Amino acid sequence: DLHRGRLLVAASVLGDPNFVRTLVLLIEVNDEGALGVVLNRPTSTTVERALGGSVEIAAVPPPSVIFEGGPVGSDTLLGVSFCDGEPALVDLEHSWGVAGRFRLFAGYAGWGAEQLQDEIAGGSWYVVPGCEGDLLTEQPEELWRVVLARQIGIIRWLSTRPLDPEQN
């Protein structure tokens, strides 16, 4: 069931290097396609260095860096927060001060109509529930394992697999 707030967990069969062991938070899903951001790819660019004093740094939890949101529109900066239990884009020009805590992403992941559904049917993604803590985690490098470990069934077992299966 695809809808806003779900997480896409990259399966090992997904051949795109942009998405190896990634978690994508879906922000928008409609008949035209889907849009999301990668939650576990922090960059070394600090929010303060990128935006100066234009953003209240306290609203961006540690690590206070820009995240690589995906391969599309890498020159686009998106703010993402949770509002009423669902992820929402933050208007960085006008209303970021009322958004509460949020993350900043350079770029995003996008799919055309039916493209994501086809990738899921092909086994490229697992779809699992997401939560605000996933977006705001202070340990994004561990998030892929943490999200998998809280699932049930075989998907939980995947959290213990090494990046290179030959190291198993």
Model-based region annotation:
Residues 1-168:
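A short aromatic-anchored loop/beta-hairpin motif
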